[in-house]
């Protein structure tokens, strides 16, 4: 076991920088005949069903020929989408519109719901004030980050929607609670960097990953997370959590592998399940280390599975850690203190 001291500026382990830009082309596309291509765009023979129209200062969607399944329109000046923009490409599967000037009022009609094969829709870094729609039932991955969204429309019927990225918007908890209830396939939800003061009610119980960092959340309702029976990754860093707002067993979730409570106002370590592997508590107000927060009892077969534990930026020091901590955290690779 390593007991180390790190600078407070150390980046979080498991940074997700760039995590929502996954544009790899499936291998099965190799060897196909390239379709016709819009003259201003690029349709390489190595990716015959992909059309790249990035960084062209386009102000509207170009002509998209039949056969295109993967359409990239990033870093342009597109400020509207006509209802007939994709009539020739009913087999379109990926539509990437990041870094444009789109507003909701200029996205016409049912332009997206007509795309019955659409799986990925990315409209990050635009000027949206609410979610787009209606959307096709085929959709699996919706990314609307870095907009000005304060309202979510209906997601009814999106039975395949698995990933939703909504970070860096202006969402409050009521807007979220009313919209996501029926998404039974949803596994990944990122609501970080919004304006929530409470945890939203009615989130789908199918979630495996939930990011709520960089909000203004100060209270965890009793047994709020208990219904998420498969939850594995939970981030609540950079909120306003204090001991008074965190019931005793809030995070005692047997499925949880990673919990981030860093940059809050906690004075004691919230109890976690022995299955937790990564626990981030840096920059709180922790005054003591209670072994019972990790191990209810100690024995040959009773110990915590913690691998990484961050405690730096707290009043705790290495000398204040109790000796039985090492027996409880016997498989830890790294414990960071001041």
UniProtKB/Swiss-Prot annotation:
Residues 1-18 form the signal peptide. Cornea and other tissues. Contains keratan sulfate. Cys-37, Cys-41, Cys-43 and Cys-53 are involved in disulfide bonds. Residues 28-66 form the LRRNT domain. One of its GO terms (molecular function) is collagen binding. The modification Pyrrolidone carboxylic acid is found at residue 19. Keywords: Disulfide bond, Extracellular matrix, Glycoprotein, Leucine-rich repeat, Phosphoprotein, Proteoglycan, Pyrrolidone carboxylic acid, Repeat, Secreted, Signal, Sulfation. PROSITE patterns: LRR. The modification Sulfotyrosine is found at residues 20-21, 23, 30. Disulfide bonds join 295-328. GO terms for biological process: cartilage development; positive regulation of transcription by RNA polymerase II; positive regulation of transforming growth factor beta1 production; response to growth factor. Glycans are attached at residues 88, 127, 160, 252. It is found in: Secreted, Extracellular space, Extracellular matrix. Belongs to the small leucine-rich proteoglycan (SLRP) family. SLRP class II subfamily. Binds to laminin. This is Lumican. The gene is Lum.
């Amino acid at each position: 076991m390593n007991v180390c001291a790190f600078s407070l500026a150390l980046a979080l382990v498991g940074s997700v920088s760039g995590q929502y830009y996954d544009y790899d082309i499936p291998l099965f596309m190799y060897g196909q005949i390239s379709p016709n291509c819009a003259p201003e765009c690029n349709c390489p023979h190595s990716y015959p069903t992909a059309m790249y129209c990035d960084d062209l200062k386009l102000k509207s969607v170009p002509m998209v020929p039949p056969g295109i399944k993967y359409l990239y329109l990033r870093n342009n000046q597109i400020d509207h989408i006509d209802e007939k923009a994709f009539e020739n490409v009913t087999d379109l599967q990926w539509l990437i519109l990041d870094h444009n000037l789109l507003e909701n009022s200029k996205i016409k009609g049912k332009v997206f719901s007509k795309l019955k094969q659409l799986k990925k829709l990315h409209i990050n870094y635009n000027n949206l004030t609410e979610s787009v729609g209606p959307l096709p039932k085929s959709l699996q991955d919706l990314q609307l980050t870095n907009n000005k969204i304060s309202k979510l429309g209906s997601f009814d019927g999106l039975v395949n929607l698995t990933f939703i990225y909504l970070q860096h918007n202006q969402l409050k908890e009521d807007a979220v609670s009313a919209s996501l209830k029926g998404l039974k396939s949803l596994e990944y939800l990122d609501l970080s960097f919004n304006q929530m003061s409470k945890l939203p009610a009615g989130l789908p119980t199918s979630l495996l990953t939930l990011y709520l960092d960089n909000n203004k959340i100060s209270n965890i309702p009793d047994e709020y997370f208990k219904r998420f029976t498969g939850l594995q990754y939970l981030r609540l860093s950079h909120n306003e959590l204090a001991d008074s707002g965190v019931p005793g067993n809030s995070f005692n979730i047997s499925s949880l592998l990673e919990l981030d409570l860093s940059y809050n106002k906690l004075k004691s370590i919230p109890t976690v399940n022995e299955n937790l592997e990564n626990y981030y508590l840096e920059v709180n107000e922790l005054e003591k280390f209670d072994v019972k927060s990790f191990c209810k009892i100690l024995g040959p077969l009773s110990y915590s599975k913690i691998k990484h534990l961050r405690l730096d930026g707290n009043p705790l020091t290495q000398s204040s850690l109790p000796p039985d901590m090492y027996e409880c955290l016997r498989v830890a690779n790294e414990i960071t203190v001041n």
